[in-house]
């Protein structure tokens, strides 16, 4: 089993537990160059999203693949979710380790007002 398959298996296991709770989830996906975040409701509809691909986020950054970029994305996604009335979420790290960019995004979202 390769690295990606292991990560996806971890992600599926975590998502099933979150689905049982029936709450909104903050989903994170990262690549070496970019990081993406979405708030998804229990009906699988995207409520809010932000990523380093977006022009509004990219303009504020020097590089899109580092911890500072993840913090910016976390702040943007939290602000957009709160505008839509979502204040509480479950954190879905998509099988990635809670470290580095993933942890930075989560911390920034918490500081911006999301609760998880």
Curated annotation (Swiss-Prot):
Q: State the superkingdom.
A: Bacteria
Gene3D superfamilies assigned to the protein according to its UniProt record, in alphabetical order: 3.30.420.100
Q: Name one GO biological process term.
A: translation
**Disulfide pairings:** none
- Report if keyword rRNA-binding is assigned: yes
Keywords in alphabetical order:
Ribonucleoprotein, Ribosomal protein, RNA-binding, rRNA-binding
Task: Give a GO cellular-component term.
Answer: cytosolic large ribosomal subunit
Q: Molecular function terms in GO for this entry?
A: 5S rRNA binding; structural constituent of ribosome
Mind telling me which residue stretches traverse the membrane in this protein?
Answer: none
- Briefly, what is this protein's role? This is one of the proteins that bind and probably mediate the attachment of the 5S RNA into the large ribosomal subunit, where it forms part of the central protuberance.
Question: Quaternary structure?
Answer: Part of the 50S ribosomal subunit; part of the 5S rRNA/L5/L18/L25 subcomplex. Contacts the 5S and 23S rRNAs.
The record, for HAMAP family, names: Ribosomal_uL18_B (MF_01337_B)
User: Under which name does UniProt file this protein?
Assistant: Large ribosomal subunit protein uL18
> Which organism does this record belong to?
Shewanella sp. (strain W3-18-1)
Q: Which gene encodes it?
A: rplR
